[in-house]
Amino acid sequence: MSQNLDQQVTLTVTLPDGTTKPLPAGSTGMDIALEIGRRLAREAVAIKIDGKAVDLSAPLTADCTAEIITFDSPEGKEIFWHSASHIMAHAIEELFPGSKFGAGPAIEQGFYYDIASEHRFTEEDLRAIEERMLLIAGRDIPIVREEMPRIQAIEYFRTVREDPYKVEILTDTLKETETVSLYHEGGFTDLCSGPHLFSTAALKAVKLFNISASYWRGDQSRESMQRIYGIAFPTEKLLKAHLSALEEAKKRDHRKLGTELELFMLSPEIGSGLPVWLPKGAIIRQELESFLKEEQRRRGYLPVYTPHIGNIDLYKRSGHYPYYSDSQFPPLTYHDEEGKAEQYLLKPMNCPHHHLIYSSKMRSYRDLPVRLAEFGTVYRHEQSGELNGLVRARGFTQDDSHIYCRPDQLVDEICNAIDLTRYVFATLGFTEVETRLSMHDPLNPSKYGGTADVWEQAEKDVREAADRMKINYFIGVGEASFYGPKIDFIVRDALGRKWQLGTVQVDYVMPERFDLSYVGSDGQKHRPIVIHRAPFGSMERFIGVLIEHTAGNFPLWLAPVQAVVLPIAEDVHDYGSEVRDAMHRAGIRVELDVRNEKIGRKIREAELAKIPFMVIVGQKEKEGGSVSLRRHRIGDEGAFSIQEMTEKLLNEIAAKGLTTKPTTNA
């Protein structure tokens, strides 16, 4: 045996299951994957070494823990899609020489790249770029990381790549960085921190969706660019499944169903981002509000109402102005009889109004907690390109509550708010819920109010409550509000998409700004702590998500029309009216269809209208004082007396259960 081999250093690699693998120093993540199995090596996207994601080609230098990252994980998808954006840029550079590249990140579903090019991209170009991406993938080009001094990288991108955008990033964003990383992919090179795929060969299927206008660094005063969106997968099967899910999502689009089911309308004459509830949609909203109001009453909340506008000084005091000035409507200026000017804002938040309600009288420690609740409408000047039906609007109603409590009550009150939010989601059929503890970014203190000590205590309280409620949570650094940390609830709908809905927030800042107090057992004034809480988040957004989650097949208690009576022939119209009236008196939302149409057509149209129950009556039912009951999407449920049928529906309404579990079928 040679002297070199005798002296070769062996490293110990510990896998997630606790087993260890001895490997020579300099082995790579791909070597580890191959040691475990060739199939895993084929599926590997990157590897975590001591908890940090790195390239599969990175050499090992010490004993470590290792975990292979595959496409199945969120982190794996992000790495795969980020690499796909590089492959797309590579393809564009080959097809359209002279193109320059801005930002090209992975996003929640795929990736995009901003391109500066004299060529105006078309749909036909997208198909050509897809083909070239697959051709590049077929070349099995290694994706190689190179670390380089920043000064040298500036010269490289200035003279070799001739890319002014990367030069700007290197001289501006990364000016404090000594060493940067580049990724080479054959003749294409990009500036990136990585990690990336081992080779282009991992990409097996790609779809580019659309082209939109963008600006360099999102600044409208800078260069105009073209943004191309796409998604890629390691198998053709996964792409087909994704495209199928997109088609299903189109069928479930709340804007489409909202029109078809006559739930709400959007009118340019009223204004962009200002949805109007039609009678059927208003019923859904009223039912949800009544449900939460009753649950809040049971849990000790007190209802309040506040105006739609407020003096601008109120929002300056709270800090909402200027923190949210970019997303607020311009102030309204009012001059009184003496010419004195006062400025008002369309209410961007309910919080300041509630704080003044709390401070309108002296509070004792025995009075706390005080739980104020309101369905309060607020207004945000969202950019027109960000508006999306109900889920992103300029005027929306929050199920807002503010809880004022003593320090010894805080964790209990946070837990109660978490419990209420969970109850709401479970009742509405959202069974997959992720929880994010949104913390402040200590490197960006100017973004937040309050002191470092206050933030440390608030975040400690949030963690304690989450742990007590046995929540599986993840940390979101920089996701906190300016006044405190949050517990954000992210639901997964029937198509697997994620939506952030409810929130619970702890606030030590506003009590100081509004000089809130209570008299303690020692006779001295003390500061309460505020909890901001909204299980729905906003009524508009929640209902928009609920429409898509259920595909408009609402549970019986929420359905705008809970049943329709369908007479088979004209000679039983009178009996149909009798059945309808009995159901109406019982409190069931019911309609009567007396059109001169065949019963089969009436049933089909009731199914299309997604009415939960069809009550069919013919001569036999009239003579027997009965009805034939049919359930939407399921079919015949049998014969019942009018009273039995009414009781059956009322029991199901009272139970507030989903009539059927949400499915992927509309």
Curated annotation (Swiss-Prot):
<dbReference type="InterPro" id="IPR004095">
    <property type="entry name" value="TGS"/>
</dbReference>
<keyword id="KW-0648">Protein biosynthesis</keyword>
<dbReference type="Pfam" id="PF02824">
    <property type="entry name" value="TGS"/>
</dbReference>
<dbReference type="GO" id="GO:0046872">
    <property type="term" value="F:metal ion binding"/>
</dbReference>
<feature type="domain" description="TGS">
    <location>
        <begin position="7"/>
        <end position="70"/>
    </location>
</feature>
<feature type="binding site">
    <location>
        <position position="402"/>
    </location>
    <ligand>
        <name>Zn(2+)</name>
    </ligand>
</feature>
<dbReference type="GO" id="GO:0004829">
    <property type="term" value="F:threonine-tRNA ligase activity"/>
</dbReference>
<dbReference type="InterPro" id="IPR033728">
    <property type="entry name" value="ThrRS_core"/>
</dbReference>
<dbReference type="InterPro" id="IPR002320">
    <property type="entry name" value="Thr-tRNA-ligase_IIa"/>
</dbReference>
<comment type="similarity">
    <text>Belongs to the class-II aminoacyl-tRNA synthetase family.</text>
</comment>
<dbReference type="InterPro" id="IPR006195">
    <property type="entry name" value="aa-tRNA-synth_II"/>
</dbReference>
<comment type="function">
    <text>Catalyzes the attachment of threonine to tRNA(Thr) in a two-step reaction: L-threonine is first activated by ATP to form Thr-AMP and then transferred to the acceptor end of tRNA(Thr). Also edits incorrectly charged L-seryl-tRNA(Thr).</text>
</comment>
<keyword id="KW-0820">tRNA-binding</keyword>
<keyword id="KW-0479">Metal-binding</keyword>
<dbReference type="InterPro" id="IPR012676">
    <property type="entry name" value="TGS-like"/>
</dbReference>
<keyword id="KW-0547">Nucleotide-binding</keyword>
<comment type="subunit">
    <text>Homodimer.</text>
</comment>
<dbReference type="GO" id="GO:0006435">
    <property type="term" value="P:threonyl-tRNA aminoacylation"/>
</dbReference>
<dbReference type="GO" id="GO:0005524">
    <property type="term" value="F:ATP binding"/>
</dbReference>
<dbReference type="InterPro" id="IPR045864">
    <property type="entry name" value="aa-tRNA-synth_II/BPL/LPL"/>
</dbReference>
<keyword id="KW-0030">Aminoacyl-tRNA synthetase</keyword>
<protein>
    <recommendedName>
        <fullName>Threonine--tRNA ligase</fullName>
        <ecNumber>6.1.1.3</ecNumber>
    </recommendedName>
</protein>
<dbReference type="Pfam" id="PF00587">
    <property type="entry name" value="tRNA-synt_2b"/>
</dbReference>
<keyword id="KW-0862">Zinc</keyword>
<dbReference type="Pfam" id="PF03129">
    <property type="entry name" value="HGTP_anticodon"/>
</dbReference>
<keyword id="KW-0963">Cytoplasm</keyword>
<keyword id="KW-0436">Ligase</keyword>
<dbReference type="InterPro" id="IPR036621">
    <property type="entry name" value="Anticodon-bd_dom_sf"/>
</dbReference>
<dbReference type="InterPro" id="IPR047246">
    <property type="entry name" value="ThrRS_anticodon"/>
</dbReference>
<dbReference type="InterPro" id="IPR012675">
    <property type="entry name" value="Beta-grasp_dom_sf"/>
</dbReference>
<feature type="region of interest" description="Catalytic">
    <location>
        <begin position="253"/>
        <end position="555"/>
    </location>
</feature>
<dbReference type="GO" id="GO:0000049">
    <property type="term" value="F:tRNA binding"/>
</dbReference>
<feature type="binding site">
    <location>
        <position position="532"/>
    </location>
    <ligand>
        <name>Zn(2+)</name>
    </ligand>
</feature>
<dbReference type="InterPro" id="IPR012947">
    <property type="entry name" value="tRNA_SAD"/>
</dbReference>
<feature type="binding site">
    <location>
        <position position="351"/>
    </location>
    <ligand>
        <name>Zn(2+)</name>
    </ligand>
</feature>
<keyword id="KW-0694">RNA-binding</keyword>
<dbReference type="InterPro" id="IPR018163">
    <property type="entry name" value="Thr/Ala-tRNA-synth_IIc_edit"/>
</dbReference>
<dbReference type="InterPro" id="IPR004154">
    <property type="entry name" value="Anticodon-bd"/>
</dbReference>
<keyword id="KW-0067">ATP-binding</keyword>
<dbReference type="InterPro" id="IPR002314">
    <property type="entry name" value="aa-tRNA-synt_IIb"/>
</dbReference>
<dbReference type="Pfam" id="PF07973">
    <property type="entry name" value="tRNA_SAD"/>
</dbReference>
<dbReference type="GO" id="GO:0005737">
    <property type="term" value="C:cytoplasm"/>
</dbReference>
